[in-house]
């Protein structure tokens, strides 16, 4: 009986420790009290990358989107390093095609405290900076801490400009000007092709079959004489 109780307690402690080694990040995008529309929600995402030391074979990565129209999002069941005072670091990148968001990079720290609890910290960590302040610098720039409870807040910097992802660097003569105007209109293009055919066809016939070309010219002259004779007789 006693051995069974010990086994149950051991199993409970193992489950509790395994649960403690998992973290959760809750965040919210604040759009100035505006609801998140379906269009915006599909074009906004949050990416998470594990950095520094990690206990798994590969660093953890994940991407999430909004949970509701209030801008809430969450990363759950995140792997954490084992041991007292051990820390686990993640970097989160908010991204949107409709808005410029701030901060554009967030350093997130999980720390296992001696009393068995898990401490969560977050810091603003903008592009162009190192993930951590360098220890080699006498007075390193400190990262600005962020509020993590009840969630990490991502704010709207301003609406993003309309982006043109494809731009023709060198516009050819076939796209602009007189040539481009003709090529972009099927009726004008058909007229030009017909005119070229009327000019080129007699030349080709004369080169390939001189007798036929001569007969065509004689027939044209005959019809012209008959036309003039008919006019003169009137």
From Swiss-Prot:
GO terms for cellular component: endoplasmic reticulum; endoplasmic reticulum membrane; membrane. It is a single-pass type I membrane protein. Residues 19-188 are lumenal. The chain crosses the membrane at residues 189-209. Keywords: Endoplasmic reticulum, Glycoprotein, Membrane, Protein transport, Signal, Transmembrane, Transmembrane helix, Transport. Its main location: endoplasmic reticulum. It is found in: Endoplasmic reticulum membrane. Coiled coil: none annotated. The keyword Transport applies. Glycans are attached at residues 35, 53, 85, 115, 170. Residues 1-18 form the signal peptide. Residues 210-234 are cytoplasmic. Present with 11700 molecules/cell in log phase SD medium. Belongs to the SOP4 family. Involved in the export of PMA1, possibly through the monitoring or assisting of PMA1 folding and acquisition of competence to enter vesicles. This is Protein SOP4. It comes from Saccharomyces cerevisiae (strain ATCC 204508 / S288c) (Baker's yeast). The gene is SOP4.
């Amino acid at each position: 009986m006693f051995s069974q109780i010990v086994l149950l307690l051991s199993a409970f402690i193992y489950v509790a420790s395994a649960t403690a080694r998992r973290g959760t990040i809750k965040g919210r995008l604040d759009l100035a009290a505006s609801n998140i529309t379906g269009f915006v929600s599909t074009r906004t995402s949050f990416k998470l990358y594990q950095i520094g030391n990690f206990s798994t074979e590969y660093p953890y990565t994940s991407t999430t989107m909004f949970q509701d129209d209030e801008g809430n999002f969450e990363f759950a069941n995140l792997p954490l390093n084992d041991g007292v005072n051990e820390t686990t670091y993640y970097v989160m990148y908010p991204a949107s095609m409709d808005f410029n968001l701030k901060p554009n990079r967030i350093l997130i720290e999980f720390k296992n405290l001696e009393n068995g609890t898990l401490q969560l910290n977050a810091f603003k960590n903008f592009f162009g900076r190192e993930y951590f302040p360098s220890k080699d610098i006498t007075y390193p720039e400190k990262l600005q801490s962020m509020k993590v409870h009840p969630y990490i807040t991502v704010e709207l910097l301003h609406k993003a400009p309309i982006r043109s992802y494809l731009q023709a660097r060198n516009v050819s003569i076939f796209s602009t000007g007189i040539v481009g105007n003709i090529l972009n209109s099927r009726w004008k293009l058909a007229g030009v092709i017909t005119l070229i055919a009327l000019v080129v066809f007699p030349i080709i016939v004369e080169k390939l079959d001189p007798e036929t070309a001569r007969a065509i010219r004689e027939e044209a002259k005959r019809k012209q004489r008959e036309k003039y004779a008919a006019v003169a007789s009137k």
